[in-house]
């Protein structure tokens, strides 16, 4: 009779020597290739997650497999091709997240028992591969770092779900910690403010206002108790205080809505149209909910929403880069990680 644990996988081979502490940076994910087949694989994994689309019933499966995965990969592949890192043949999100991991490892290099790696919730490198690699390096403690400032079940929680699924298949599990959301952390707000001020100083025009655009979500998710909207509001209010502006000069909007349900409002694209029609001619957009530039910032904001604004009468538009692997951005990640590693290092 087998004595293996249910669904147990082979335990990663562990190097001998001092036990180490692992740090795993995790972002959302990206297709492996900027073509329809690659996008289809990515979208199927992403949209099959019940944390993302809560109703995974028969109707949704028919819609997903019979409609969405037949048409959407072609159009989204064209969007990815606009921003693709052709030199490395990967998305900017993958390039930046790798660099964040490398820079964090360098910052912690004086602690030789700390190992840093990175993973994506959907696509590659997977969370499983990241955890396996850390265990193979001798890590008996792992800090998972979801790179989402504002908590949502559809982002932070699904990272935890996947980490737990991976650990559930191991007989010898490492001790686990997860960094909390950091939507009003002082280091995060300061880094955002510095990035905005630095970027605005490089522009040949002065924006009449700034739009803070966050990824949207169905309103029903918030109605059921998701704190995401509350966190986005808190971030925006903290940023207004730090910049010394009021709500008329730093607007809060939500982007990337999908499907026919009502999502959190005001919508970013509709706001771009309205502002231009009301006579606003110069704006800048910051995306505080994204730790790294990706399709939603580089294509949807910097290209699509810029076009909407200018088509309706706007003249000058600037997308402020995410914190990425900049010095202020790395200060945020390093601060979060060192805080949560207390007692381990």
From Swiss-Prot:
Listed GO MF terms: ferrochelatase activity; metal ion binding
GO biological process, one term: heme biosynthetic process
EC main group: lyase
Keyword field contains Metal-binding: yes
CDD domains assigned: Ferrochelatase_C, Ferrochelatase_N
Gene3D superfamilies: 3.40.50.1400
InterPro entries linked to this entry: Ferrochelatase, Ferrochelatase_AS, Ferrochelatase_C, Ferrochelatase_N
Family matches, as Pfam families: Ferrochelatase (PF00762)
Key word Isomerase present: no
Tree of life domain: Bacteria
Binding-site list for Fe cation: 215, 296
A GO cellular-component term linked to this record: cytoplasm
Catalytic activity of the protein: heme b + 2 H(+) = protoporphyrin IX + Fe(2+)
EC number(s) reported in the record: 4.98.1.1
Chief location category: cytoplasm
Pathway assigned to this chain's UniProt record: Porphyrin-containing compound metabolism; protoheme biosynthesis; protoheme from protoporphyrin-IX: step 1/1
Keyword field: Cytoplasm, Heme biosynthesis, Iron, Lyase, Metal-binding, Porphyrin biosynthesis
Localisation: Cytoplasm
Family (UniProt): Belongs to the ferrochelatase family.
Function: Catalyzes the ferrous insertion into protoporphyrin IX. Essential for normal nodule development.
PANTHER family: FERROCHELATASE, FERROCHELATASE, MITOCHONDRIAL
Protein name, per record: Ferrochelatase
Source organism of the structure: Bradyrhizobium diazoefficiens (strain JCM 10833 / BCRC 13528 / IAM 13628 / NBRC 14792 / USDA 110)
């Amino acid at each position: 009779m087998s004595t293996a644990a249910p669904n147990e996988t082979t335990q990663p081979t562990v190097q001998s020597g001092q036990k180490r502490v692992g740090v795993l940076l995790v972002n959302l994910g990206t297709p492996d290739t900027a073509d329809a087949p690659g996008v289809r694989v990515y979208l199927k994994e992403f949209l099959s997650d019940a944390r993302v689309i809560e109703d995974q019933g028969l109707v949704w499966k028919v819609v997903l497999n019979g409609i969405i995965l037949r048409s959407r990969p072609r159009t989204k592949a064209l969007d990815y091709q606009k921003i693709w890192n052709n030199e490395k043949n990967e998305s900017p999100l993958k390039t930046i997240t790798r660099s964040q991991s490398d820079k964090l490892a360098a910052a912690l290099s004086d602690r030789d028992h700390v190992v840093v790696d990175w993973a994506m919730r959907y696509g590659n490198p997977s969370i499983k591969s990241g955890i396996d690699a850390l265990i193979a390096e001798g890590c008996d403690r792992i800090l998972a770092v979801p790179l989402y400032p504002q908590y949502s079940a559809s982002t932070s929680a699904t990272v935890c779900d996947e980490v737990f699924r991976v650990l559930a298949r191991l007989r010898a599990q490492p001790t686990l910690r997860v960094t909390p959301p950091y939507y009003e952390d002082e280091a995060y707000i300061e880094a955002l403010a510095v990035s905005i001020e630095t970027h605005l100083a490089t522009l040949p025009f002065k924006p009449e206002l700034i739009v803070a655009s966050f990824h949207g979500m169905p309103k029903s998710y918030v109605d059921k108790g998701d704190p995401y909207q509350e966190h986005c509001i808190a971030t925006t209010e903290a940023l207004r205080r730090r910049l010394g502006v009021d709500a008329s000069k730093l607007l809060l909007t939500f982007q990337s809505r999908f499907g026919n349900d009502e999502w959190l409002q005001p919508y970013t694209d509709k706001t771009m149209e309205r502002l231009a029609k009301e006579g606003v001619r110069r704006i800048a957009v910051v995306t505080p909910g994204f730790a790294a530039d990706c399709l939603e910032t580089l294509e949807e904001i910097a290209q699509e929403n810029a076009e909407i604004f200018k088509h309706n009468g706007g003249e000058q538009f600037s997308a402020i880069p995410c914190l990425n692997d900049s010095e202020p951005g790395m200060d945020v990640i390093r601060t979060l990680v060192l805080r949560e590693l207390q007692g381990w290092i």
